[in-house]
Amino acid sequence: MANVQENAKASVATTPQSLPKLSPSEFRIYNSMADHMDLFHNRFRQTWNALYTAASRGQRPEGMSMKQFVNGGLQFCEHLHLHHTIEEMHIFPVLARKMPAFRKELELLTQHKQIHAGLDQFQAYLEACASGERELRMTELKALMDRFGTVLWTHLDDEVEQLGAENMRKYWTPAEMRTMPM
């Protein structure tokens, strides 16, 4: 009976509610990856919003040529592909040692696959528009973006949440945080 009570106490001791409040310094250490990731993700959000707003309105932003608009969309695709490649090769394997959310075939990597299924179609369409093979139609562009927009935005938020201080402190020490690949 004593072992059951000790195990119950140990379980309670590791719940987030029972963790001591982080000092501002500790919070910065534990939240550093979330802050860094959010900088990248905010750029993706800004670019997505510009592209999606134009597609929804049926017109490019004022003063932007067709070529600039299409190239902006292609850069978004290239940057997101590169971002996910870096995560999957250099960051997720380190995090996956202790954090289940970053392991293969779990939520975050599954989201990458779902995003890229739509992103690849979006990119192929823009490449066809850039080459002159297709004419850019904003309704088509919006429909392509709608295929992966929800999972993309969910992923951008989920990843930062997983890297947040309150979650990271469950798995890593401050010393380990200082050695992270970001």
Which positions does each model-derived feature cover?
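Small-residue-biased structural context
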Residues: 1-182
